[in-house]
Amino acid sequence: MSGFYQASLRSRGIEPVMPAAAAQRDIAACIEAVKATQIDAAAGHLSRALATLERRKVSVAVMGCTEIPIAARALRNARVMLIDSTQELARATVAYAVERGWGRAA
């Protein structure tokens, strides 16, 4: 983990919660399962990781890897709000471009 999201959250007064070692292993297994196109298995790993976060009273999790949202779509009842970092980056990029008039005919 690079620490990018943690630093950004702290700069906004939000204290990040890192997944425990077992949850990190489940997240890694989730990513590997997605790469192997084993989406149901990936969702199971992700569900276990999210359950550990929920027990720690975490209500929002950043999906900071492109494979995780693929597994998340297969979840049935995620009780932790999931933020897709790739989707949010795309939204911010479009907003940035629109604010500057990029793509408009002169």
Outline where the language-model segments fall.
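Non-catalytic structural scaffold of enzyme domains
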Residues: 1-106
